[in-house]
């Protein structure tokens, strides 16, 4: 009887483990000179993405433009504003995982003029996210949780409005940012 119980328990655990969701934390983030926090070595959104990946056990995927943005803030925003005005789709570097193989996706980006940075649109137009669950998180300095409606339209996914954290909090008050992440990610 004990052997049968052990076998059944093993089978149940195996089924339970097989049913776990594969989680991806995909984000765009920019270091260098940033609004409000100056020159930084790690972008605000990257800091939050790492917290979420650690909390969920998810795989990190950094979306990177093939051509880096200028390091200076003013030069960067000039390029980014032009991309937005042209609805550009800048080339991105190849990624090391297939995002289509994941069940649940956390998507993070800094809010630039009420939108995701344009390399994120390139990413989402390249990969099929239809039917997936996307949980959004953003860093900002006053725009709040922006870009979600357009993300729904571009992906066809079940996009949830999620977490908005000030960039200066992500950068300079990491304990506070971690508490916000912990409260949001269940």
Language model segments and positions:
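Positively charged n-region of N-terminal signal peptides that target proteins for export
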Residues: 1-4
């Amino acid at each position: 009887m004990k052997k049968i119980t052990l076998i059944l328990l093993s089978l149940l655990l195996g089924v339970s483990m097989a049913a776990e969701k594969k989680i991806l934390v995909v984000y765009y983030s920019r270091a260098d000179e940033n609004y409000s926090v100056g020159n930084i070595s790690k972008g605000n959104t990257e800091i939050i993405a790492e917290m979420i990946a650690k909390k969920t056990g998810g795989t990190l995927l950094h979306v990177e433009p093939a051509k880096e943005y200028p390091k200076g803030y003013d030069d960067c925003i000039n390029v980014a504003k032009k991309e937005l005005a042209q609805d550009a789709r800048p080339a991105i570097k190849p990624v090391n995982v297939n995002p289509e193989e994941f069940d649940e996706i956390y998507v993070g980006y800094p809010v630039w003029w009420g939108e995701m940075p344009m390399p994120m649109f390139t990413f989402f137009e390249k990969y099929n996210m239809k039917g997936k669950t996307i949980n959004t998180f953003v860093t900002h300095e006053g725009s709040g949780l922006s870009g979600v409606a357009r993300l729904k339209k571009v992906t066809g996914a079940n996009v949830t409005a999620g977490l908005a954290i000030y960039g200066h909090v992500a950068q300079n008050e990491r304990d506070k940012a971690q508490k916000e992440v912990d409260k949001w990610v269940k």
